[in-house]
């Protein structure tokens, strides 16, 4: 109860602040809890600071999880559009606890070395094909949840990333058809244990990327039609208020369409699947000397039009 209360207070406080990048005011789908509701619900985050529209109250036949919502495609999206246009009563921020917009997806696909300026930071060549790895779904937490430092690592680092959420099943998808399989976009924090990436576990990346709480997502799934150009968005990360990463998604080596086409050669995409598209320069490990997260730090990951997620390190 204390944790939920702290999350609701943080939600209310951050909504009162002015952030550098203004979020889209269109379709912003969220998963949330509220004290008077049983279990998670689907909602629409309003862009004017008003709160959250409860989609399940608007139409009780709607599913209560984002994955099930996306599986039904246009039928459920049309209900959400009607709710947005209806100017319904909203739940105030102070009563809402935001969950990750997608929880327990079939897969979380991650991409390494996918920003030109991040490659320059490391003095390495730009990859000729996408570098793919994964996180377990159990690493996903909400946009304002805490990141827990694991005792197994002394080198936990930050990474702000644009996340793509799949809305339509597919395999062997052509790049020209890829955006038809995208539901929308959200902000991700790809928390990374550098010692486990570079010196442990045979230098395989999985364990260092997938500790519990190592994948905060949110605050909303912004539908693709609400984002003018996902490959021209300002992206930044702040640690304790200091800007540590600042770039633009136009620096991505492989764009959303290329990543979907590449990965779908190997696996089937399902609604709710998440693709973390890589991070820009400014991570702690490449600073001189290296800097890593410590207890008490606060990390803010923000992307233009999508919003900001804030995670305290404990």
Curated annotation (Swiss-Prot):
Organelle transit peptide residues: 1-84
Cofactor: binding details: Requires a divalent metal cation for activity.
SUPFAM superfamilies for the chain: FAH
Cofactor list: Mg(2+); Mn(2+)
Compartments where located: Mitochondrion
Gene Ontology molecular function: any one: metal ion binding
GO cellular component: a single term: mitochondrion
Family annotation (InterPro entries): FAH, Fumarylacetoacetase-like_C, Fumarylacetoacetase_C_sf
GO annotation terms (biological process): oxaloacetate metabolic process
EC primary class: isomerase
Family affiliation: Belongs to the FAH family.
Known function: Tautomerase that converts enol-oxaloacetate, a strong inhibitor of succinate dehydrogenase, to the physiological keto form of oxaloacetate. It is thereby required to maximize aerobic respiration efficiency by preventing succinate dehydrogenase inhibition.
Protein name: Oxaloacetate tautomerase FAHD2B, mitochondrial
Organism: Homo sapiens (Human)
């Amino acid at each position: 109860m204390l944790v939920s209360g702290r999350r609701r207070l943080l939600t209310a406080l951050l909504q009162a602040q002015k952030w550098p990048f203004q979020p889209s005011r269109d379709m912003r789908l969220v998963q949330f809890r509220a004290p008077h509701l049983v279990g998670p619900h689907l909602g629409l985050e309003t862009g004017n600071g008003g709160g959250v529209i409860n989609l399940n109250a608007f139409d009780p036949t709607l599913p209560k999880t984002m994955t099930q919502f996306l599986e039904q495609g246009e039928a459920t999206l049309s209900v959400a559009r009607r709710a947005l246009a209806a100017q319904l009563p909203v739940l105030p921020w102070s009563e809402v606890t935001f969950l990750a917009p997608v929880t327990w997806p079939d897969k979380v696909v991650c991409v390494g070395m996918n920003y030109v300026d991040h490659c320059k930071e490391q003095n390495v060549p730009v990859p000729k094909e996408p570098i793919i790895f994964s996180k377990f779904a159990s690493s996903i937490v909400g946009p304002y949840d805490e990141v827990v430092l694991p005792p197994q690592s002394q080198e936990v680092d930050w990474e702000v990333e644009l996340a793509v959420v799949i809305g339509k099943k597919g395999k062997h998808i052509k790049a020209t058809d890829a955006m038809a399989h995208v539901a929308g976009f959200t902000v991700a924090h790809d928390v990374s244990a550098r010692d486990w990436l570079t010196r442990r576990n045979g230098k395989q990346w999985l364990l260092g990327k997938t500790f519990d709480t190592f994948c905060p997502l949110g605050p909303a799934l912004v539908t693709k039609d609400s984002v003018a150009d996902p490959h021209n968005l300002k992206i930044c990360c702040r640690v304790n208020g200091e800007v540590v990463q600042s770039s633009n998604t136009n620096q991505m080596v492989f764009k959303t369409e290329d990543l979907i086409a590449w990965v779908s050669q190997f696996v089937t995409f399902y609604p709710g699947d998440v693709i973390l598209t890589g991070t820009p320069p400014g991570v702690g490990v490449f600073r001189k000397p290296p800097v890593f997260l410590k207890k008490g730090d606060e990390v803010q990951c923000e992307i233009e039009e999508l919003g900001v997620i804030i995670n305290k390190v404990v």
